[in-house]
């Protein structure tokens, strides 16, 4: 019997102000863990899988139950330690220490590969935490929508003079992360054709308003795109098909999209990518009997897809890797020029990282959408001179369906995160918000990740693989008083290719929270400015000087 599978489970986080735990500092991680497994949030909640192939919230259901039990009895001077989804210890610390410290999927570098991890996973000794799955701050597909939107806006500026009308994006994957592409693309003015082999995922994106239409043939999908472009109104289409098949077929037909990318779960060839010609049932059966065959076939199909992406790039498409390590997989299968198209961070996002700008997110623990709408208004009030941000918040309210507890994401940087958070804390204190909020972020941020094929690709000084930075980030956030801090390996791009840290803090309206919030949400983005200044980026150096950061080697 698989202790990770229980179809009888239906997890819904409590709403309102009644506590199940001894304070909001422990109620918050409990609700957010539960929210990660909400049926409208998680990809496979019955298996504890939140997103990203096998990214889990807890190692198994026994561990989940025990985590909840411990959080409900945890005192405000105690800290729970979670090792790869398993609660392993409670220790006396102090009131400003994190209530939970999490380490997920971390392996000694020589053994940091999928083969060794999968053996540990089978033995029940490890859990793949992805980024926000095992760190309990996943907010559904919204969590990556704005970052994807910002990327597509940058693509339009760089390649099409800012004009996206009448243009379309080809991509693959409509899972928890990939599902953002369709909505983000149409928000940015593009039509989007997204290939997905799992029809339930397309239907899920239709239900949550991330996809406009479903197609079952390439001809049908292309007709939908053409009709929308002729009408000047962008549309998103979920095509039930294998991305490798579709990408190669478009090359064969001589049909060139304007933009090409991919967000299949290529980072995990065993569990995340369906080989060409295979059904999902066949793949599921083969994973139990011949893992090596599945991996080989999946990587061979990735090679086909990447070759097609290169061919489409040659034909004129703006082509980018969206951080799932598909280029690496294809390179290992003999596609020697797999890295000829860039990753999205060095191509479009790094200037934002240099100012500590990244995916700031918050969640209303009350469960009341009005709390989010009030914080939206507060963001506009405190940042009045950013029409791009205001436009994002307006579009988000109009077009993004909340999944689980109401949440919002917006990309802001060093100069704004702490003051926004302090304002939210004050809103809780004076009763404007009906309950506390938690503030966190993706591990994809400016100072919290080392990932040479994604966030730290092509660093100016060649420090792509130096992973001291996320370790320092986690240590500093712990010292600063975050409510929970996490340190993971392998998120986004798979085992052996990344290390990254997460942080969440509770705004409960107290003066003590204000002090913690002020420290954490200044120091956290400041480490990103520090990291990029150290690598030699002038934008980061200037930001550090303007914000008064004490960086000894930058004097």
Swiss-Prot record:
What chemistry does it catalyse, as a reaction equation?
A: 4-imidazolone-5-propanoate = trans-urocanate + H2O
Which EC numbers does the record give? Answer: 4.2.1.49
Q: Quick one: which pathway?
A: Amino-acid degradation; L-histidine degradation into L-glutamate; N-formimidoyl-L-glutamate from L-histidine: step 2/3
The domain of life is: Bacteria
Q: Provide GO CC annotations from the record.
A: cytoplasm
* Listed GO biological process terms: L-histidine catabolic process to glutamate and formamide; L-histidine catabolic process to glutamate and formate
HAMAP family, alphabetically?
Answer: HutU
Q: What is the name listed in the Swiss-Prot or TrEMBL entry for this protein?
A: Urocanate hydratase
């Amino acid at each position: 019997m698989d202790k990770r599978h229980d179809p009888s489970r239906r997890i819904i986080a409590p709403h309102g102000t009644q506590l199940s735990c001894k304070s909001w500092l422990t109620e918050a991680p409990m609700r957010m863990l539960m929210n990660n497994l909400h049926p409208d949030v998680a990809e496979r909640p019955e298996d504890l899988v939140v997103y990203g192939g096998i990214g889990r919230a807890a190692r198994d259901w026994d561990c989940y139950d025990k985590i909840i039990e411990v959080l409900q009895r945890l005192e405000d001077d105690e800290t729970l330690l979670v090792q790869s989804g398993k609660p392993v210890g409670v220790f006396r610390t102090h009131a400003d220490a994190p209530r939970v410290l999490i380490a997920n999927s971390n392996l000694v570098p020589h053994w940091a590969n999928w083969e060794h991890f999968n053996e540990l996973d089978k033995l029940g000794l490890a859990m793949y935490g992805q980024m926000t799955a095992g760190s309990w701050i996943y907010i559904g597909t919204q969590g990556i929508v704005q970052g994807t939107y910002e990327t597509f806006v940058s693509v339009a500026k760089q390649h099409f003079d800012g004009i996206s009308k009448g243009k379309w994006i080809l991509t693959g994957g409509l899972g928890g992360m990939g599902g953002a592409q369709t909505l983000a693309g149409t928000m940015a003015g593009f039509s989007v054709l997204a290939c997905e082999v799992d029809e339930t995922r397309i239907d899920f994106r239709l239900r949550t308003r991330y996809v406009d239409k479903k197609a079952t043939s390439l001809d049908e999908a292309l007709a939908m795109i053409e009709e929308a472009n002729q009408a000047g109104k962008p549309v998103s289409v979920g095509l039930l098909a294998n991305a490798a098949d579709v990408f190669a077929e478009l090359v064969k037909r001589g049909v060139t999209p304007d933009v090409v990318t991919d967000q299949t779960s290529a980072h995990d060839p065993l569990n995340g990518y369906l080989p060409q010609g295979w059904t999902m049932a066949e793949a599921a059966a083969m994973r139990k009997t011949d893992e090596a065959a599945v991996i080989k076939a999946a990587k061979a199909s990735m090679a086909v897809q990447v070759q097609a992406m290169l061919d489409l790039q040659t034909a004129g498409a703006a082509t980018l890797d969206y951080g799932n390590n598909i280029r690496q997989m294809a390179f290992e299968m003999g596609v020697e020029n797999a890295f000829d198209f860039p990753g999205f961070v060095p191509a479009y996002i790094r200037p934002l990282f240099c100012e500590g700008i990244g995916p700031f997110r918050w969640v209303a623990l009350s469960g009341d959408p009005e709390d989010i709408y009030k914080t939206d208004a507060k963001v506009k009030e405190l940042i009045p001179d950013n029409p791009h941000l205001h436009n994002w918040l307006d579009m988000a309210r109009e077009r993004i369906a909340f999944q689980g507890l109401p949440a919002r994401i917006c990309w802001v940087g060093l100069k704004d995160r702490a003051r926004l958070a302090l304002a939210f804390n004050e809103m809780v204190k004076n009763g404007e918000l009906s309950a506390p909020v938690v503030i966190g972020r993706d591990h994809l941020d400016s100072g919290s990740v080392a990932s040479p094929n994604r966030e730290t690709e092509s660093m100016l000084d060649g420090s792509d693989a130096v992973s001291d930075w996320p370790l320092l980030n986690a240590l500093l956030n712990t010292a600063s008083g975050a409510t929970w801090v996490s340190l993971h390996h392998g998120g986004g791009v798979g085992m052996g290719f990344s290390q990254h840290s997460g942080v969440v803090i509770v705004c409960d309206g107290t003066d003590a929270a204000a002090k913690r919030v002020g420290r954490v949400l200044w120091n956290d983005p400041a480490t990103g400015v520090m990291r990029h200044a150290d690598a030699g980026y002038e934008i980061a150096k200037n930001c550090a000087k303007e914000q008064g950061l004490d960086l000894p080697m930058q004097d």
